[in-house]
Amino acid sequence: MAITRRSFLKGVATTSAASVIGPSLLASASANAAESTGTWKVTGSHWGAFRAHIYAGKVQEIKPLELDKNPTEMLNGIKGIIYSPSRVRYPMVRLDWLKKHKYSADTRGNNRFIRVTWDEALDLFYRELERVQKEYGPWALHAGQTGWNQTGSFNNCTAHMQRAVGMHGNFITKVGDYSTGAGQTIMPYVLGSTEVYAQGTSWSEILENSDNIILWANDPVKNLQVGWNCETHESFKYLAELKEKVAKGEINVLSVDPVKNKTQRYLENDHLYINPMTDVAFMLAVAHVLYNENLYDKKFIDTYCLGFEEFIQYVQGKTKDKVEKTPEWAAAICGVKADKIREFARMLVSGRTQILMGWCIQRQEHGEQPYWAAAVVAAMVGQIGLPGGGISYGHHYSSIGVPSTGFAGPGGFPRNLDQGMKPKWDNNDFNGYSRTIPVARWIDCLLEPGKEINYNGGKVKLPDFKMMVISGCNPWHHHQDRNRMKKAFRKLQTVVTIEFAWTATCRFSDIVLPACTQWERNDIDVYGSYSNKGLIAMHRLVDPLFQSKPDFQIMSELTQRFGRREEYTRGMSEMEWIESLYNDCKKANEGKFEMPEFNEFWEKSVLDFGEGKPWVRHADFRKDPELNPLGTPSGFIEITSRKIGRYGYEHCQEHPMWFEKSERSHGGPGSDKYPFWLQSCHPDKRLHSQMCESEEFRATYAVQGREPVYINPIDAKAKGIKDGDLVRVFNGRGQLLAGAVLTDSYPRGVIRIEEGAWYGPLNEKEGAICTYGDPNTLTQDIGSSELAQATSANTCIVDFEKFTGKVPPVTSFGGPIEVA
């Protein structure tokens, strides 16, 4: 039975059935199918656990696992991933690279490839590793890309690639990620941890104790459909309870967001529209009200915080900018009336208030500031560490807020060399370059090699790398400014990509090796990313299609070419590794959780450890800040960071501040030419770019075969655009085609194209239109500030018009142009 939007939302409104006391063994992995033909197998994914009906060597049907009471409709897209026309079928080498080698950069991206054998492809891969280490050194090889990969503890493709390549020689790697780069860098200075990936106060504590919940740029109903590990969707039972409490008037929920998002439509809660990228101005005005009306918790500030006086002097306009951050000042920037700002500030202290921040808000220029300013507002309210109060930065992610059982999940395949082992090319001379770079600044390395940039209190010298190895991630999705990327990629001599789907990253590579999907190999994974509800056996559903191979096999064959296969595999097969990881996990949980022998677990497929105990974030710190200090330099909440102040940065100073953006809609810089803000948030029907290749599922939301662009009806009417029209969206960085969806969920001056839409350029030339609708064709590639150097994708303004020319075919999903 297919999962529909209606059945998904109905599931959200049901309460999850209670689990049995203690661990239980659920459901055979290979029970006979009800149809008496084929078998049913249990496996998992980022979208949840499911049973697959296998007949004649093919997946026929997918059903959610019974433990998942709120399965996502995206499970309907999994078959389309396995059998996608976009699969990488054979080892492929770019034709001009094979003919002209490193002198073929001008045609990179033309998608013309020639099929080769596995031996030929791996020989070329190894030859290039040898050449680069011999001619240049470790600074010339980048193997540190980032991505969600696929689920599974053993088959982490990045770990397999980095262990294998690392056995050959050292390489450039990265720090940070695209999702939370600014947030995870600033928050250790403020609250002592990254916060974004930390377990948060349990939903049950919030529902029981909160009077007010602020969803700030936060859309959990959309984002909790996916999880880092195999997702359980347990959060949705709490969201259903929250919906009931909102309807009864027991909890006041307010969304602060430039758009009316999916969560607000589900909860039917109040909404405060705010101009894009102006939240910090709003927050500073809230702080002004709390201070000047004497509403803030002075005792909390004095007991648990440092640097309040310096910050409040800035808010009062008594520092160098001489601007008092009044509600009237903020209203002119953020579009919220001054009286509404005062009303909001008073509401925060009217009862127990839980602030739940999203991630989209920190993916902008000066993205460190809204997270820091929000923490200061929460500190002034004075409820950090109380049940149902304080601030969280992750309740929309991977079931954060679902109580953890305390089960210690299995380890993974090691990405580093074993102790005492050295690479074949044991060279640690990086020629004065930095060996680790901020993840979002790698294109800068290609365009400005040798440039020294500030980063998090230190200096980074951008390496002049010549070769990239990319495994299981799609930088031609998650990085910004496609035309800048085209220019940069022409500087590379060799790009090797290991992938199961022919993404734009493959299009711009030289050697492409076909990995299989996670459903064509065996694995094991935690069931419930933060709840650690259980353990799931991820059974191979079908054999690897075409000539694809598991990453473990690919890298085993690569390491064999330089005599390191035995060290790489430790002499174990795939199933021996999985059993070893299980047994280590069993030992780690001895005396806490009962786990059967491996074969019994593998047959039964799922261990369920029930529910964990509720927890309150920062409660220990509040109880005794001396005994339980935060991880900040002082151990306290740092409203002012003297450490950051000593860095002397222009765009991230000693306390939260308002910085104007380089471009901004609604009267901001550049809005006279490009008046619309482009929001490129996480998609509703994908995991980033994963599942965009699933044809039938993509057809459920695409418009004329293109990615939707969501437009306010009044803005659309002014440009003669109707629902379903093709639209050209453009700015000085690029242009794309998308299909118009008119909705009043978006205010005037705001459009949305969700990230993860596959880049499909009309050709390899700079400036070519994207035929499908990748928003990163338009976004700018600049660092958030000198502190985090993180992505600033949401600092992006555009214009749009009805497309009237000859409609080009979509080029995103057809695979390579194979040249005989």
Curated annotation (Swiss-Prot):
- PROSITE patterns membership: MOLYBDOPTERIN_PROK_2, MOLYBDOPTERIN_PROK_3, TAT
- Which PANTHER family does the protein's record reference? TRIMETHYLAMINE-N-OXIDE REDUCTASE, TRIMETHYLAMINE-N-OXIDE REDUCTASE 1
Give residues annotated as binding Mo-bis(molybdopterin guanine dinucleotide).
Answer: S179
Main location class: periplasm
Question: What EC number(s) has UniProt assigned to this enzyme?
Answer: 1.7.2.3
Cofactor binding, per record: Binds 1 molybdenum-bis(molybdopterin guanine dinucleotide) (Mo-bis-MGD) cofactor per subunit.
Recorded hits in SUPFAM superfamilies, A to Z, give: ADC-like, Formate dehydrogenase/DMSO reductase, domains 1-3
Q: Where are the transmembrane segments?
A: none
An example molecular function term from Gene Ontology annotations: trimethylamine-N-oxide reductase (cytochrome c) activity
Q: Which UniProt keywords apply?
A: Metal-binding, Molybdenum, Oxidoreductase, Periplasm, Signal
Q: What is the species listed in this Swiss-Prot or TrEMBL entry? A: Vibrio parahaemolyticus serotype O3:K6 (strain RIMD 2210633)
- What is the organism lineage in this UniProt record? Bacteria, Pseudomonadati, Pseudomonadota, Gammaproteobacteria, Vibrionales
Catalysed reactions listed for this entry: trimethylamine + 2 Fe(III)-[cytochrome c] + H2O = trimethylamine N-oxide + 2 Fe(II)-[cytochrome c] + 3 H(+)
Q: Does the keyword Coiled coil apply?
A: no
Q: Which GO terms describe its cellular component?
A: outer membrane-bounded periplasmic space
Q: Which InterPro entries match?
A: Asp_de-COase-like_dom_sf, CT_DMSOR/BSOR/TMAOR, Molybdopterin_N, MoPterin_dinucl-bd_dom, Mopterin_OxRdtase, Mopterin_OxRdtase_prok_CS, Prok_Mopterin_Oxidored, TAT_signal
> What sort of enzyme, by top EC class, is this?
oxidoreductase
Describe the task this protein carries out: Reduces trimethylamine-N-oxide (TMAO) into trimethylamine; an anaerobic reaction coupled to energy-yielding reactions.
Checking Gene3D superfamilies in the record gives: 2.40.40.20, 3.40.50.740, Dimethylsulfoxide Reductase, domain 2 (3.40.228.10), Dimethylsulfoxide Reductase, domain 3 (3.90.55.10)
Protein name as annotated: Trimethylamine-N-oxide reductase
Location(s) in or outside the cell? Periplasm
Residues annotated as signal peptide:
1-33
- Modification comment: Predicted to be exported by the Tat system. The position of the signal peptide cleavage has not been experimentally proven.
